[in-house]
Amino acid sequence: MKHRAKEEEEENRLVQILGGYRIAMNDRRTRSTVSVVALKRIFGCILVLVFFVGFSFSNLPLTGNFRQRLISSWQTQGLKSISGNSSAVSVRETVLFPDQAFIFLKYPQGAPLFTKNDIDCVYFSPNSPQPHLDLQPDSIDSEDHDLQIVRCPLQTRGVTVSIGIKSNGHLLPIGPTFRWDSLAYEALIDYDNTTIVFVKGLNLPPKRVMDPSQFECVYGRDFTASNLLLLARVISIGQEIVRCKTPLSILSGSQSVNSSIKVSVRGVDKPVISSVARPYRRLDHNPPSQKQHQMCVCTMLRNQARILREWVMYHAHIGVQSWFVYDNNSSDDLSSLIELLDDENFNITRHAWPWIKTQEAGFAHCALRAKDSCEWVGFIDVDEFLYFPSGLPLHDVIGNLTSNVAEVRVWCHNFGPSGLKRVPTKGVLLGYTCRMDAPERHKSIVRPEALNSTLINSVHHFHLRSGFEFVNMERNALVINHYKYQVWEVFKEKFYRRSTTYSSDWQDNENLESKDRTPGLGTEAVEPPDWSTRFCEVVDTGLRDQVVEMLSDPKTQMLPWQK
């Protein structure tokens, strides 16, 4: 009891320290207001001179996609909210990826969000306080009403990026900037009040549970101020997934207070990894005893809108009841399609997942979100379709399993271009009918509440809790048709970036013998002359015939996703 009381006292002291820090910062801002007003008058005069001097150099040419803009047109000052209130839109943080900068904008409550045409990405050279280039954002994304992700192209290393508002020329102050290769990027609080933290840069081996005593979790607002940090025990750690004991002050704090607290991890005697992860309680304290859905599906995708409608409608017909779509930086208006499907009463949700090469972490995150409503969850891609050759319904197949079975492993049949050179107009199910003879690695359908607490997975399989086991499904009962090698126009997109943590990108000259790579292809997206006839050993029209019989309109012969 004494130890518990001491723990609570230390945590309460942290809350007081953090609160005092906030008050001190507010006082400091108040004291600086007078001097800022005086400086603004001087700065205004200087700005006029800079404008005329700068104008004489404004005709210097810029190459590439960069659009020229007078330096003096961007006013480096805080932006008042769009609605005219005193609250400010701000850059909460920026994360630098290899080819893009992701700028997270924080909005006042109720303020309308910017569109892509409202803003520019504005670039600063190293050691220069003045912007020199601007570009239109690659895309803008939002899931919450008060947070927006602006994706800015990053063609030069070493630059810093902010956001310029076209309507008034205001430039948002640059927020904290972090490198993607070492970052705690996501966190949530589980049913048992532990915090799950997803961390890039630990560089741990795949599929292995590590010694948690060699790490510790760190909570705080500012990880550079060691006296304002709270340490917590690591319960488990493996891959990019860390489970932490959550401090009582975090559990008892309000959501508004906790929104400014971040969590990260450090190895013993090592610095704290930078963080943008805030431990939100996204899961219900009291999940229902009766699951709402027997069968759900999780998927992670990028620019797959063209196939999503077919994938959802087919799986709805065979018994899938809910879809969790993790959008990994799509630019093909996927969100609009998901809204349309939702309006058509498909229980589908989109979750913005901007983090690259984190599919294992994303699936673990999805398993946590799905376990309160789904008895079973399948982890498959949108070019993978569950197929029941015997005609036995999905709910009978999984409903007849014993209670100690927590994972169903399903073989995959890989289909090739099937002689096609253009995208099939009636969809993949009718278009691709020729496949490889030998089946390939499994994909899994799991009971999410039976997963090991480490949440370690290899995309295809999860580690299970003690007492549970997996079964291999017979291929005559259930198999996955994987339309893996489609026409070249579609297939070449796989060269952009692989989504798994431990797979090399196909443009990299490493791990060339990996099963993730395509036989006979190098590191460049160059179409082989015989591509359309490759990977064709067995003509298989089983699923196509089922689909035509079950789903085609008797009058028009059209399929639901063609209407």
Predicted regions, residues:
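Beta-strand/beta-sandwich contexts
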Residues: 45-117, 176-209
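Short, acidic, metal-binding catalytic loop of nucleotide-sugar glycosyltransferases
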Residues: 313-322
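Short beta-strand-to-loop acidic/aromatic patch adjacent to the donor-nucleotide binding site
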Residues: 325, 374-387, 408
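Active-site beta-to-alpha loop of glycosyltransferases that engages the nucleotide-sugar donor
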Residues: 299-313, 329
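Short beta-strand/loop segment that forms part of the nucleotide-sugar
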Residues: 321-329, 351-352
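Extended low-complexity, serine/threonine- and proline-enriched intrinsically disordered segments
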Residues: 110-131, 211-224
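Active-site-proximal specificity loops/subdomain of glycosyltransferases
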Residues: 281-292, 296-298, 331-377, 388, ...
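Catalytic-site signature of metal-activated, phosphate-bearing donor transferases
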Residues: 2-70, 79, 143-147, 151, ...
